[in-house]
């Protein structure tokens, strides 16, 4: 490791700021590209059920490459891994701009995102240490939330003006992320010299899966975070379908504004969880998870914009309070058992598998003609029941 990295572990170091800027631009591009590509599908008269399929090809890339991306992140300098991953995202977005099938281009973006995730979190521990690492994670999450808010809104607003302009803006964001990655110090690979045989890599990954699943706390965390993020991405697409039906608004911007309210709420809920929940009292977050489903069902019955905003803000607050303690639990327990990189890769597999399942069920419901309001109510009720079942299961496991 270079001397500059050894001595400068400040969260305001050049390397750390480069990581944060790259993360913001990359996440901005991800969120803007989703809504810009959805607008492109609408403009090209794709059926409604194809919208969640777009996200399914994205998360499918995460699942397919899950056994390998953790080792890739640990075998090379993580800053360079992030740069190559953002380059793949840039190629996918540029391809969509140039007329490549949007599903093909978005799959390439998904491959880049899969490779990017373990590297972006793993590099924080190489650039700083101790209490500063907690603050660095906070900066990373803050930049991500800001990118979700601004990227989602920018994608929808620009798409209402000009779809191709929105897609070009996404490509430029990814290009900026690649440029920012160039300023990250070239760190020594964490675990060089590992076997690149597919069978060995796959065995190593699934061995980590088994270790985490056999531990009651990490299993509880994996299921909880998987349910949450699966529900979260499904809600995004439900809003795109629900807004014109319930509110009579047909633009591309309104669903992005509503999604932004959820992101704002997550920030508030995450702050509350940091103050009120510890690793020893993680079960305090479970009532919030049940209430997410209840509020989603109530939200689905609304016909005015103001209560819709308020309820989505509440959903976000409940979500932040629910998921942050579960993430912390998995990171802490996983670091001690299989390593942080493997724990993140396994969590990504679980979350994206849940997304794929929920999006598949949602696509099927849309395909057979279930009304958007009915989908929302059923979705909320099922989510509340699933979290309640998880809570009961966790309490029984703890009593043994």
From Swiss-Prot:
UniProt keyword Cytoplasm, yes or no: no
Entry-linked Pfam families: MFS_1
Keywords, ordered alphabetically: Cell inner membrane, Cell membrane, Lipid transport, Membrane, Transmembrane, Transmembrane helix, Transport
Spans through the membrane: 19-39, 53-73, 91-111, 139-159, 164-184, 195-213, 227-247, 257-277, 281-301, 304-324, 352-372, 373-393
MF terms (GO), sorted A to Z: lysophospholipid:sodium symporter activity
NCBIfam families reported for this sequence: PRK11195.1
Family in the record: Belongs to the major facilitator superfamily. LplT (TC 2.A.1.42) family.
Record protein name field: Lysophospholipid transporter LplT
Organism of origin: Salmonella paratyphi A (strain AKU_12601)
Gene that produces this protein: lplT
């Amino acid at each position: 490791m270079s001397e500059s990295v050894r001595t400068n572990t400040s969260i305001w170091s050049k390397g750390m700021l480069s990581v944060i800027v790259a993360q913001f631009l990359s996440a901005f591009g991800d969120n803007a590209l989703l809504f810009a590509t959805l607008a492109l599908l609408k403009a090209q008269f794709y059926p409604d059920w194809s919208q969640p399929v777009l996200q399914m090809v994205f998360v499918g890339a995460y699942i397919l490459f899950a056994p390998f991306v953790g080792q890739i992140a640990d075998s090379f300098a993580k800053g360079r891994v992030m740069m190559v991953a953002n380059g793949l995202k840039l190629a996918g977005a540029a391809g969509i701009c140039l007329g490549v099938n949007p599903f093909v281009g978005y799959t390439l973006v998904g491959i880049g995102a899969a490779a990017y995730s373990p590297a972006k979190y793993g590099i924080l521990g190489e650039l700083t240490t101790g209490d500063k690492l907690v603050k660095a994670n906070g900066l990373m999450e803050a930049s991500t939330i800001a990118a979700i808010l601004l990227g989602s809104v920018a994608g929808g607003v620009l798409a209402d003006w000009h779809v191709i302009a929105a897609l070009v803006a996404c490509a430029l964001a990814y290009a900026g992320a690649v440029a920012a990655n160039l300023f990250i110090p070239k760190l020594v690979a964490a675990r060089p010299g590992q076997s690149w045989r597919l069978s060995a890599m796959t065995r190593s990954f699934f061995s980590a899966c088994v270790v985490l699943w056999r531990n009651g706390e990490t299993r509880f965390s994996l299921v909880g975070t998987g349910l949450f993020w699966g529900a979260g991405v499904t809600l995004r697409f439900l809003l795109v379908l629900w807004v014109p039906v319930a509110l009579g608004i047909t633009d591309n911007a309104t669903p992005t504004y509503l999604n932004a309210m959820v992101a704002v709420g997550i920030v508030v809920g995450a702050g509350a969880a940091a103050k009120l929940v510890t690793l020893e009292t993680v079960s305090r977050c479970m009532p919030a998870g049940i209430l997410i489903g209840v509020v989603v069902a109530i939200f689905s019955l609304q016909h005015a914009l103001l209560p819709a905003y308020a309820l989505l803000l509440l959903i976000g607050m409940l979500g932040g309070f629910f998921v942050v303690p579960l993430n912390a639990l998995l990171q802490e327990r996983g670091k001690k058992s299989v390593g942080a990189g493997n724990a993140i890769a396994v969590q990504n597999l679980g979350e994206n598998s849940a997304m794929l399942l929920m999006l598949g069920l949602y696509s099927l419901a849309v395909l057979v003609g279930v009304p958007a309001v009915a989908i929302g109510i059923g979705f909320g009720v099922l989510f509340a029941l699933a979290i309640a079942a998880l809570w009961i299961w966790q309490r029984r496991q703890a009593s043994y």
